């Protein structure tokens, strides 16, 4: 089975609208992350990235419904301002495999030079958490 990851960057608090439109077209839901832009320019403003606060929306769908989901998202945002945001898709089928597709073999290299630390903090504390991580060597 083939999968596509739909990624959108939209104004802050507009992510729910994107996920609802996707669900209406058959998606099973989505993930909304709070994003913060760091650069400002006329080009970024033209692309819809003018203000710093953004929602990054990720929706995983099967290939056969991708076009319907994207169309529903675009249609649901047509009444918004011209530069509402940006939307694109990635083919992630090679990254997503069911356990039985590889015969149950473990192919992960357990020796790693890096570690992933995931942290969930209350709204407004992200910069404090990042500052603490950087001071600890991250």
Q: What function would you assign to each model-found segment?
A:
Residues 1-138:
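Positively charged, small/polar-rich N-terminal and surface patches that mediate targeting and assembly
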């Amino acid at each position: 089975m083939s999968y596509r990851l739909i990624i959108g960057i939209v104004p802050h608090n507009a992510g729910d609208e994107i996920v609802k439109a996707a669900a209406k077209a058959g998606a099973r839901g989505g993930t909304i992350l709070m994003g913060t832009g760091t650069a400002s320019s006329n080009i970024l403003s033209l692309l819809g990235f003018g203000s710093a606060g953004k929602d990054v929306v990720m929706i995983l769908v099967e290939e056969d419904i991708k076009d319907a989901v994207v169309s529903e998202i675009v249609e649901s945002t047509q009444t918004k301002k011209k530069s509402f945001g940006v939307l694109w898709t990635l083919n992630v089928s090679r990254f997503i495999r069911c356990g039985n597709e590889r015969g149950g073999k473990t192919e992960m290299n357990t020796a790693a030079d890096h570690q992933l630390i995931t942290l969930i903090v209350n709204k407004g504390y992200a910069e404090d958490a990042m500052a603490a991580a950087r001071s600890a060597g991250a």
